[in-house]
């Protein structure tokens, strides 16, 4: 007996409950990284070349990225016997910012950018303002 469905693909879908059950059984391949501050994070084993900043310190997930950010005697730059490109020999200067709070811009009393091109804002009636508020 032929199907009355107009679809040419007649394969059945796996129910969502079964999909969730399969996904829960699958183990996530990741490793735990403990930071000096006491925090820890997990990184997927297939995730490379991604870094992030936590409490003002940049953390890297790949050995190539660590080579740029480590700047002490434990750095792989000083222990690697291979010839390095000349770009690594340039000293990268990092500034230690003691104040981690970024200043906010002050509020102005002038026209906003959105309404700066509208003529005669003083001529708007109460019904006009109620219309704008309803949007």
UniProtKB/Swiss-Prot annotation:
Function according to Swiss-Prot or TrEMBL: Strong activator of the late viral genes promoters. Acts as a suppressor of RNA-mediated gene silencing, also known as post-transcriptional gene silencing (PTGS), a mechanism of plant viral defense that limits the accumulation of viral RNAs. TrAP suppresses the host RNA silencing by inhibiting adenosine kinase 2 (ADK2), a kinase involved in a general methylation pathway. Also suppresses the host basal defense by interacting with and inhibiting SNF1 kinase, a key regulator of cell metabolism implicated in innate antiviral defense. Determines pathogenicity.
Assembly and binders: Monomer. Homodimer. Homooligomer. Self-interaction correlates with nuclear localization and efficient activation of transcription. Monomers suppress local silencing by interacting with and inactivating host adenosine kinase 2 (ADK2) in the cytoplasm. Interacts with and inhibits host SNF1 kinase. Binds to ssDNA.
Name of the protein: Transcriptional activator protein
Family that this chain belongs to: Belongs to the geminiviridae transcriptional activator protein family.
Ranges spanned by the short sequence motif Nuclear localization signal, renumbered to the chain: 17-32
GO cellular component, one term: viral capsid
Gene Ontology MF terms: DNA binding; structural molecule activity; zinc ion binding
Zinc finger (unnamed): 37-54
Secreted as UniProt keyword: no
Residue span of region Transactivation: 120-135
Entries under InterPro entries matching the protein: Gemini_AL2
Domain characteristics, as noted in the entry: The zinc finger and the transactivation region are involved in PTGS suppression.
Keyword line: Activator, DNA-binding, Host cytoplasm, Host nucleus, Host-virus interaction, Inhibition of host innate immune response by virus, Metal-binding, Phosphoprotein, Suppressor of RNA silencing, Viral immunoevasion, Zinc, Zinc-finger
Location(s) in or outside the cell: Host nucleus; Host cytoplasm
One of the GO biological process terms: symbiont-mediated suppression of host innate immune response
Post-translational events: Phosphorylated.
